[in-house]
UniProtKB/Swiss-Prot annotation:
It holds the Pfam family PP-binding. This is Anthracycline acyl carrier protein DpsG. Residues 3-80 form the Carrier domain. GO terms for molecular function: phosphopantetheine binding. Pathway: Antibiotic biosynthesis; daunorubicin biosynthesis; Antibiotic biosynthesis; carminomycin biosynthesis; Antibiotic biosynthesis; rhodomycin biosynthesis; Antibiotic biosynthesis; aclacinomycin biosynthesis. GO terms for biological process: daunorubicin biosynthetic process. It comes from Streptomyces peucetius. SUPFAM superfamilies: ACP-like. Keywords: Antibiotic biosynthesis, Phosphopantetheine, Phosphoprotein. Involved in the biosynthesis of aklanonate which is an important precursor common to the formation of the clinically significant anthracyclines such as carminomycin, daunorubicin (daunomycin), rhodomycin, aclacinomycin T (aklavin) and aclacinomycin A (aclarubicin). These compounds are aromatic polyketide antibiotics that exhibit high cytotoxicity and are widely applied in the chemotherapy of a variety of cancers. InterPro entries: ACP-like_sf, PKS_PP-bd, PP-bd_ACP, Ppantetheine_attach_site. The modification O-(pantetheine 4'-phosphoryl)serine is found at S40.
């Protein structure tokens, strides 16, 4: 079973930002995507990348509550376990 790691999420977020700078996720449980410079479009690009890479559907209506990298990890990994 595949699982999304914090390092993988960090790289996907860097790609979504379109920058060489990698976001610092030291406080992944409290820092928001907005604090990291990701607007809603960048978060959507991150979600789309995860869906393509991991072959999992992440329902948009449930994503509204996902505001931090840590909550994204939990959200994605729960879906991956359910799909296994």
């Amino acid at each position: 079973m595949a699982e999304l790691s914090l390092a993988e999420l960090r790289e996907i977020m860097r790609q979504s930002l379109g920058e060489d700078e990698v976001p610092d996720l030291a406080d992944a449980d409290t820092v928001t995507f907005e604090d990291l410079g990701l607007d809603s479009l960048a978060v959507l690009e991150t979600v789309n990348h995860i869906e393509r890479t991991y072959g999992v559907k992440l329902p948009e209506e449930e994503l509204a509550e996902v505001r931090t990298p840590h909550s994204m990890l939990i959200f994605v990994n729960e879906r991956l376990r359910a799909a296994a």
